[in-house]
Amino acid sequence: MKLWGGRFTKETNQLVHNFNASLSFDQKFYEEDIEGSIAHVTMLAEQGILTNEDKEAIIGGLQSIRDDIRDGKLVFTEEHEDIHSFVEAHLIERIGDAGKRLHTGRSRNDQVALDMKLYTRKEIKEMEHLLFGLLQSLLKIMKENIDTIMPGFTHLQKAQPITLAHHMGAYFEMFYRDRSRLQDIHKRMNYCPLGSGALAGTTYPLNRERTAELLGFTGPTLNSMDSVYHNNR
């Protein structure tokens, strides 16, 4: 599925297609892309923009695509430019015209921003979990070695006697700060960009608060331009 070039009379040069394509790396967003689309069409149906029949067909199609990718039954191919066109093309192939209404009230810009936020949020949670386990291990070592003496170094030279608990405690503090930074990032980025459109929103009567709620965000982003531009920073 081509996302642009409707005015062109010839096929895009293969080199240009390859240069623009991002499926080789954004395919890792397939779960987030589908999760966001399910929330989006749920909101559209609640707002009366889509029929419930279309909503159910789209959600069923998206879930089957997700399951087939997980099971290795659906393979990513170079004919699609990115994960969004890949999912949408297969959805239309499976459920027909209803699949063409998936993208109602949405732009690739706010869709990409959403996918990146959902993926980043998932990875932050995983890193937090791993850091918590590391902190627990360090704490255990510290408790077991309160009286274990070792040399403390400065300029690669033995300088003062310290305990192993004190030495490991330094790393505990460092990793604790790292975990706090991740928590801060999560707090600041946990706002939903859907509804921002290409840069200035949409005329469809979307319920951005509802979409944000369905996806577990604190709320919707406040400025549509910031929502879609900040990925370039």
Can you say where each PLM-predicted feature lies in the sequence?
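Acidic, glycine-rich loop-and-beta core segments that form the ion-binding/anion-interacting portion
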Residues: 215-233
